[in-house]
Amino acid sequence: KKYYSMRKILLITLAAMTIYACNNNGSGVKKGSREAGSIFYKEYDTPFGAPPFDEISEEDYRPAFAKGIEEQNKEIDSITNNPEAPTFENTIVALDFSGSILDRVSNVFFGLEGAEKTDTIEKISIDITPVLSEHSDNIYLNSKLFDRIKTLHDDTTGLNLTTEQYRLLDKYYKNFVRSGIMLNDAEKQRLREINKELSSLT
């Protein structure tokens, strides 16, 4: 998941979101009565699971990004520190389901950034993009995590994977390789520096 380049705000449910935004009756939690960012901390309780745009303010994004990164780091640590041998469920599925908070806030923020960029949104984008780039590097250059993926990818005998499951495993394996996991430590550090520089230019 390359969050800092995300621009795909729920295209499949765009019509549903539009209807909801237009017809919402104002019920639900108001912006001032909850912790900033908490709107993104769980699944949306809205028709079609659409983001409740009328309840989201610019003050929600920074804490939600911070919380999302923190929670995904915990989820990744749980995978890499699992004493059990890697399985499709405890490694690939767990990885695929990680970062739900970050997914929600990224989808909304980067989608709205392109549609209605305010000075505040622009400042948040400038600040958060390098942070998300570093977070992505921390995942895709995580040797312990890749070792578990590689173990599964190198020998799928006995895994009894469906075609869809194998494609997901193969996708993650290739994403890690393309992101530089095979580089030596010095090369990885240089890659991090390049990615940081590039993220500061976007």
Segments predicted by a language model, with ranges:
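Bacterial Sec-dependent N-terminal signal peptides
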Residues: 1-33
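Zn2+-dependent metallopeptidase catalytic domains
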Residues: 22-202
